Amino acid sequence: MLRLRPAVRAVSVARSVALTRSLHVSVAKFNKIEGTAPAGLPKEVKQTAGHQGHHQEIPKPDENHPRRKKFHFWRSLWRLTYLSAIASLGYIGYRIYVIRNPSDQLPADPSKKTLVVLGSGWGSVSFLKKLDTSNYNVIVVSPRNYFLFTPLLPSCPTGTIEHRSIMEPIRGIIRHKQAECQYLEADATKIDHEKRIVTIRSAVSENSKEEVIKEIPFDYLVVGVGAMSSTFGIPGVQENACFLKEIPDAQQIRRTLMDCIEKAQFEKDPEVRKRLLHTVVVGGGPTGVEFAAELQDFFEDDLRKWIPDIRDDFKVTLVEALPNVLPSFSKKLIDYTEKTFSDEKISILTKTMVKSVDENVIRAEQTKGDGTKETLEMPYGTLVWATGNTVRPVVRELMSKIPAQKGSRRGLLVNEYLVVEGTEGIWALGDCSATKYAPTAQVASQEGSYLANLLNGIAKTEDLNNEITNLEKQSEHTFDEQERKNIFAQLESKSRKLRRSRAMLPFEYSHQGSLAYIGSDRAVADLSFNFWGIMNWSSGGTMTYYFWRSAYVSMCFSMRNKILVCIDWMKVRVFGRDISRE
């Protein structure tokens, strides 16, 4: 037996290994054609079996791998966000196009009844928004040719919101109605409910005292003229206070406030300086609370940076005659608001009644906890009066002519259908009416929507009555049996519709809740939900502040208002508020 040397043995082993590999490759090539692979082949060879190409098969990714699932989630979320942004921009663009390009309207029909609407506030505009103007010849009369979004009015004097951002032209509203409406910029001075005539007065120009007096006959009248600020007969309020109900009021507050700040720069007497920089807000309702909060924000965020000399003397005081501010809110939110004001260094004087006002000093009477009363004197630079309503002269004049209105002081007495007591075909809504509900924008808005549906139903009822009368006349002159059956079937159908249209329910207010901004990016919300019963939800803080903003934006009348308000908020966040006089 021959013994191989180690070198020869190594060569033989190498050749054997090479031969084995060659054999495996040959078998693999054969099995590519047959589509099978023997079980004994290595894993690398098995992976090539059954394929027509020469490349090794790439393993498929594991779809259930956590990283790949996460990647798919974020990619889907990005696509959804991208598509939502495109859809939102498309919708906004469409709405802007519709606003800028109103469609043609039906011409006025002299045969229709004349409906006169007095006012351009929450009640009147909500009424016009829902009214089918093709049923009437509509005439709108108001000295203010725009609708004002009053919940954001306290933000205007400080520059948080530009006043034009919360104004919507009345002509822009009625131009988008189905049929033509007429607008007259004038004051209603007299309402003759017996002759059914409204007398209006309009100035020809600002620089002319010449006036135009016109009488407008009407079939139906909607009175929504609102109310004026009440001074409660307190001496000096009308002459020295700034009110907060209209755009000119907000502009007057701005001028007065900046005048006091600029005067304080020249004043060396510390007491006079403190007086000039002291702003007193009378009224602890939402308007007064929100303005006090906005003013303190204006000082903290802007004034103290650009006018550092006033930082030690600037002061805001809120005066309320009731035991607490925001009386319509829950006790928890009242306490939270008062604590927030204390943290913001806003002074609150509750149970305090103003007795008189002169040019520089407010005299008030405060009731202590033990029932004793103390007289207070508050030097002030700016006085903002944000409490109380009283009826307008045209409403008072109408009330004096109707015996059923003699006992009313708050406004026109109305029944459950908002019809003015003692009249026919005259309705009143909003702050000019006296109901069991609070005089708020929410109440006026719901009254306007209800009244529009009521008037639409009245028009439908009249049309059905006319159609029934015509069918009855037609049946008298028809002798064909089949045609008579068709007429009677139509009469029965229209009679059912007539009964349904007449079955109008009385007005019922649905309270949705109350909101108020309390400063430092915080707000309070007292909301009501009707889910199998009334449910109340109270909240306060920063998250409620963002809810307050989103709610007010959604309540803005038009897409234009929504966009402008959001832009104003962004401008203040980026650049701060303007500190110029105007």
Swiss-Prot record:
Q: Which residues make up the transit peptide?
A: 1-30
Its Enzyme Commission number?
A: 1.6.5.9
Q: Which residue spans adopt a coiled-coil conformation according to this UniProt entry?
A: 454-501
EC category: oxidoreductase
What's the catalysed reaction? a quinone + NADH + H(+) = a quinol + NAD(+); a ubiquinone + NADH + H(+) = a ubiquinol + NAD(+)
A cellular component annotation (GO) from this entry: mitochondrion
Q: Where is this protein found?
A: Mitochondrion inner membrane
Domain of life, per lineage = Eukaryota
Residues that bind FAD, according to the entry? 114-144
Q: Which cofactor does it need?
A: FAD
Question: Is Membrane found in the keyword set?
Answer: yes
Give the cofactor note text. Answer: Binds 1 FAD per subunit.
Q: Which residues bind NAD(+)?
A: 277-313
Q: Name one GO molecular function term.
A: NADH:ubiquinone reductase (non-electrogenic) activity
Q: What membrane topology does the annotation report for this chain?
A: Peripheral membrane protein
Per the record, the similarity remark reads: Belongs to the NADH dehydrogenase family.
Q: What does this protein do?
A: Alternative NADH-ubiquinone oxidoreductase which catalyzes the oxidation of mitochondrial NADH does not translocate protons across the inner mitochondrial membrane.
Protein name, as recorded: External alternative NADH-ubiquinone oxidoreductase, mitochondrial
Q: From what organism does this protein derive?
A: Yarrowia lipolytica (strain CLIB 122 / E 150)
Lineage, top ranks:
Eukaryota, Fungi, Dikarya, Ascomycota, Saccharomycotina
